[in-house]
Amino acid sequence: MAFTFKQFHIDDLNCGMPVSTDGVILGAWAPLSRAKHILDIGAGSGLLSLMAAQRSQGQITAVELEEKAAAACQYNMTQSPWADRCKLIHGDIQHVCQQAEYQEYFDHIICNPPYFEHGPKANEQHRAMARHTDTLGFTPLLEAISQCLSHEGHASLILPIQSLTRFKACLHQTQLYLVKEVRVKSMENKDANRVLLLLAKILLTQSQDEPCQHTELTLRGEDGRYTEQMIALTKDFYLKL
Protein backbone atom coordinates (compact mmCIF):
# COMPACT_ATOMS: atom_id res chain seq x y z
CA MET A 1 0.00 0.00 0.00
CA ALA A 2 1.33 3.43 -0.95
CA PHE A 3 0.76 6.78 0.76
CA THR A 4 1.75 10.22 -0.50
CA PHE A 5 2.61 13.07 1.86
CA LYS A 6 3.35 16.69 0.98
CA GLN A 7 7.10 16.17 0.57
CA PHE A 8 7.61 12.41 0.26
CA HIS A 9 5.99 9.11 -0.65
CA ILE A 10 5.83 5.83 1.26
CA ASP A 11 5.33 2.47 -0.46
CA ASP A 12 5.41 -0.47 1.94
CA LEU A 13 6.03 -2.91 -0.97
CA ASN A 14 3.66 -5.37 0.75
CA CYS A 15 6.00 -5.73 3.73
CA GLY A 16 3.16 -5.68 6.28
CA MET A 17 4.12 -2.28 7.69
CA PRO A 18 1.94 0.37 5.98
CA VAL A 19 1.57 3.99 7.06
CA SER A 20 -0.36 4.27 10.34
CA THR A 21 -1.91 7.18 12.19
CA ASP A 22 0.23 6.24 15.20
CA GLY A 23 3.38 6.69 13.15
CA VAL A 24 2.27 10.02 11.68
CA ILE A 25 1.36 11.41 15.11
CA LEU A 26 4.68 10.31 16.61
CA GLY A 27 6.73 11.63 13.70
CA ALA A 28 4.98 15.01 13.84
CA TRP A 29 5.09 15.31 17.66
CA ALA A 30 8.66 14.28 18.49
CA PRO A 31 10.91 17.32 19.20
CA LEU A 32 13.35 16.77 16.34
CA SER A 33 14.12 20.23 14.97
CA ARG A 34 17.51 20.59 16.69
CA ALA A 35 18.60 16.96 16.49
CA LYS A 36 21.81 16.28 14.58
CA HIS A 37 21.86 12.48 14.81
CA ILE A 38 18.51 10.65 14.84
CA LEU A 39 17.95 6.91 15.27
CA ASP A 40 14.74 5.20 14.11
CA ILE A 41 14.42 1.81 15.86
CA GLY A 42 12.27 -0.68 13.97
CA ALA A 43 11.94 1.64 11.00
CA GLY A 44 9.44 -0.46 9.05
CA SER A 45 8.92 1.10 5.62
CA GLY A 46 10.68 4.32 6.67
CA LEU A 47 7.83 6.64 7.67
CA LEU A 48 9.41 8.00 10.86
CA SER A 49 12.83 8.33 9.26
CA LEU A 50 11.47 10.46 6.44
CA MET A 51 9.32 12.57 8.75
CA ALA A 52 12.44 13.15 10.84
CA ALA A 53 14.40 14.09 7.73
CA GLN A 54 11.72 16.61 6.72
CA ARG A 55 11.59 18.17 10.18
CA SER A 56 15.32 18.43 10.86
CA GLN A 57 18.70 18.91 9.25
CA GLY A 58 20.05 15.84 11.05
CA GLN A 59 21.53 12.58 9.85
CA ILE A 60 18.98 9.75 10.04
CA THR A 61 19.94 6.15 10.86
CA ALA A 62 17.13 3.61 10.44
CA VAL A 63 17.43 0.10 11.88
CA GLU A 64 15.09 -2.62 10.60
CA LEU A 65 15.42 -6.37 11.15
CA GLU A 66 12.74 -7.77 8.82
CA GLU A 67 14.03 -8.23 5.27
CA LYS A 68 10.99 -7.04 3.30
CA ALA A 69 10.51 -4.00 5.50
CA ALA A 70 14.19 -3.11 5.20
CA ALA A 71 13.91 -3.27 1.41
CA ALA A 72 10.87 -0.97 1.49
CA CYS A 73 12.63 1.43 3.84
CA GLN A 74 15.70 1.60 1.61
CA TYR A 75 13.52 2.18 -1.46
CA ASN A 76 11.55 4.99 0.17
CA MET A 77 14.69 6.67 1.48
CA THR A 78 16.33 6.54 -1.94
CA GLN A 79 13.26 8.09 -3.57
CA SER A 80 13.01 10.90 -1.01
CA PRO A 81 14.52 14.41 -1.18
CA TRP A 82 16.77 13.52 1.77
CA ALA A 83 18.50 10.38 0.50
CA ASP A 84 21.90 11.89 1.29
CA ARG A 85 20.98 12.20 5.00
CA CYS A 86 19.34 8.80 5.46
CA LYS A 87 21.08 5.49 6.14
CA LEU A 88 19.53 2.05 6.65
CA ILE A 89 21.02 -0.69 8.80
CA HIS A 90 19.39 -4.05 8.06
CA GLY A 91 19.88 -5.83 11.36
CA ASP A 92 19.04 -6.19 15.03
CA ILE A 93 19.10 -3.04 17.18
CA GLN A 94 20.59 -5.06 20.04
CA HIS A 95 23.60 -5.79 17.84
CA VAL A 96 23.79 -2.23 16.54
CA CYS A 97 23.83 -0.69 20.01
CA GLN A 98 26.83 -2.83 20.95
CA GLN A 99 28.94 -1.10 18.31
CA ALA A 100 31.18 1.57 19.82
CA GLU A 101 30.41 4.12 17.10
CA TYR A 102 26.72 4.21 18.06
CA GLN A 103 26.99 4.21 21.86
CA GLU A 104 25.74 7.50 23.34
CA TYR A 105 25.79 8.87 19.78
CA PHE A 106 22.20 9.87 18.99
CA ASP A 107 20.59 13.01 20.36
CA HIS A 108 17.12 11.78 19.43
CA ILE A 109 15.69 8.27 19.11
CA ILE A 110 12.23 7.57 17.69
CA CYS A 111 10.36 4.28 17.90
CA ASN A 112 6.85 3.01 17.24
CA PRO A 113 7.18 -0.37 18.98
CA PRO A 114 5.21 -3.51 18.08
CA TYR A 115 1.93 -3.28 19.90
CA PHE A 116 0.20 -6.66 20.27
CA GLU A 117 1.56 -8.02 23.55
CA HIS A 118 -0.92 -10.89 23.81
CA GLY A 119 -3.42 -12.77 21.69
CA PRO A 120 -3.07 -14.53 18.34
CA LYS A 121 -0.25 -13.51 16.07
CA ALA A 122 -0.72 -12.51 12.46
CA ASN A 123 -0.55 -15.33 9.94
CA GLU A 124 2.40 -14.08 7.96
CA GLN A 125 5.73 -13.97 9.77
CA HIS A 126 6.75 -10.53 8.53
CA ARG A 127 3.44 -9.04 9.64
CA ALA A 128 3.71 -10.80 12.99
CA MET A 129 7.15 -9.27 13.48
CA ALA A 130 5.71 -5.84 12.80
CA ARG A 131 2.89 -6.22 15.31
CA HIS A 132 4.00 -8.53 18.14
CA THR A 133 6.33 -7.70 21.03
CA ASP A 134 8.11 -11.08 20.92
CA THR A 135 10.65 -9.59 18.49
CA LEU A 136 11.72 -6.72 20.74
CA GLY A 137 10.17 -6.39 24.21
CA PHE A 138 10.19 -3.24 26.31
CA THR A 139 13.21 -4.15 28.45
CA PRO A 140 15.66 -4.79 25.59
CA LEU A 141 14.21 -1.81 23.71
CA LEU A 142 14.85 0.50 26.66
CA GLU A 143 18.33 -0.96 27.12
CA ALA A 144 19.09 -0.19 23.47
CA ILE A 145 17.77 3.35 23.84
CA SER A 146 19.85 3.88 26.97
CA GLN A 147 23.00 2.65 25.23
CA CYS A 148 22.55 4.68 22.05
CA LEU A 149 21.19 7.93 23.52
CA SER A 150 23.55 10.83 24.22
CA HIS A 151 23.63 12.28 27.74
CA GLU A 152 21.37 15.20 26.85
CA GLY A 153 19.33 13.39 24.20
CA HIS A 154 15.67 12.38 24.13
CA ALA A 155 13.64 9.42 22.89
CA SER A 156 10.07 9.61 21.57
CA LEU A 157 7.68 6.64 21.47
CA ILE A 158 3.98 5.89 21.02
CA LEU A 159 2.26 3.00 22.81
CA PRO A 160 -1.24 1.62 23.31
CA ILE A 161 -2.57 2.90 26.61
CA GLN A 162 -2.94 -0.63 27.99
CA SER A 163 0.83 -1.14 27.70
CA LEU A 164 1.72 1.96 29.72
CA THR A 165 1.83 0.36 33.17
CA ARG A 166 4.13 -2.44 32.05
CA PHE A 167 6.28 0.01 30.10
CA LYS A 168 6.72 2.23 33.17
CA ALA A 169 7.67 -0.78 35.28
CA CYS A 170 10.41 -1.61 32.76
CA LEU A 171 11.44 2.05 32.57
CA HIS A 172 12.10 2.20 36.32
CA GLN A 173 14.79 -0.45 35.89
CA THR A 174 16.79 1.78 33.53
CA GLN A 175 18.72 5.05 33.58
CA LEU A 176 15.89 6.74 31.67
CA TYR A 177 12.96 8.75 32.96
CA LEU A 178 9.68 10.11 31.61
CA VAL A 179 9.70 13.80 30.62
CA LYS A 180 6.32 14.09 28.86
CA GLU A 181 3.22 11.92 28.60
CA VAL A 182 0.51 12.83 26.09
CA ARG A 183 -2.64 10.72 26.18
CA VAL A 184 -4.15 10.44 22.72
CA LYS A 185 -7.91 10.17 22.14
CA SER A 186 -9.08 9.11 18.70
CA MET A 187 -12.33 11.06 19.21
CA GLU A 188 -13.47 13.72 21.65
CA ASN A 189 -16.09 11.51 23.27
CA LYS A 190 -13.81 8.48 23.75
CA ASP A 191 -11.17 7.48 26.27
CA ALA A 192 -7.50 7.73 25.35
CA ASN A 193 -6.23 4.62 23.55
CA ARG A 194 -2.65 5.69 22.77
CA VAL A 195 0.07 7.56 24.63
CA LEU A 196 3.02 9.60 23.36
CA LEU A 197 6.10 9.45 25.59
CA LEU A 198 9.26 11.56 25.73
CA LEU A 199 12.19 10.03 27.62
CA ALA A 200 15.55 11.39 28.73
CA LYS A 201 18.59 10.07 30.55
CA ILE A 202 18.91 10.46 34.30
CA LEU A 203 21.94 12.65 34.97
CA LEU A 204 23.93 12.67 38.21
CA THR A 205 22.46 16.07 39.09
CA GLN A 206 18.82 15.04 38.88
CA SER A 207 16.34 12.59 40.32
CA GLN A 208 14.20 10.00 38.55
CA ASP A 209 11.26 11.47 40.48
CA GLU A 210 11.32 14.80 38.64
CA PRO A 211 7.75 15.67 37.58
CA CYS A 212 6.47 14.55 34.20
CA GLN A 213 4.37 16.87 32.03
CA HIS A 214 0.90 15.38 31.35
CA THR A 215 -1.28 16.60 28.48
CA GLU A 216 -3.90 15.28 26.05
CA LEU A 217 -4.24 15.19 22.27
CA THR A 218 -7.63 14.63 20.61
CA LEU A 219 -7.56 13.63 16.95
CA ARG A 220 -11.21 14.10 15.93
CA GLY A 221 -14.18 15.99 17.29
CA GLU A 222 -17.65 14.54 17.78
CA ASP A 223 -18.44 15.47 14.17
CA GLY A 224 -15.63 13.18 12.96
CA ARG A 225 -13.48 16.03 11.66
CA TYR A 226 -9.88 16.57 12.66
CA THR A 227 -9.47 18.85 15.68
CA GLU A 228 -7.43 22.04 15.55
CA GLN A 229 -4.81 20.17 17.59
CA MET A 230 -4.51 17.45 14.99
CA ILE A 231 -4.46 19.88 12.06
CA ALA A 232 -1.72 21.97 13.66
CA LEU A 233 0.31 18.83 14.36
CA THR A 234 0.08 17.19 10.92
CA LYS A 235 -0.52 20.03 8.43
CA ASP A 236 3.06 19.86 7.14
CA PHE A 237 2.51 16.24 6.10
CA TYR A 238 -1.06 15.42 5.10
CA LEU A 239 -1.95 16.59 1.59
CA LYS A 240 -5.49 17.72 2.38
CA LEU A 241 -4.65 19.85 5.41
Curated annotation (Swiss-Prot):
What CDD domains does UniProt report for this protein, alphabetically? AdoMet_MTases (cd02440)
Give the molecular function GO annotations.
nucleic acid binding; tRNA (adenine-N6)-methyltransferase activity
SUPFAM superfamilies xrefs: S-adenosyl-L-methionine-dependent methyltransferases
Chain's role:
Specifically methylates the adenine in position 37 of tRNA(1)(Val) (anticodon cmo5UAC).
The protein here is known as: tRNA1(Val) (adenine(37)-N6)-methyltransferase
Q: Which family does it belong to?
A: Belongs to the methyltransferase superfamily. tRNA (adenine-N(6)-)-methyltransferase family.
This protein's species is Shewanella sp. (strain ANA-3)
Task: List, alphabetically, the GO terms of the cellular component aspect.
Answer: cytoplasm
What is catalysed by this protein?
Answer: adenosine(37) in tRNA1(Val) + S-adenosyl-L-methionine = N(6)-methyladenosine(37) in tRNA1(Val) + S-adenosyl-L-homocysteine + H(+)
Quote the Pfam families the UniProt record gives: MTS
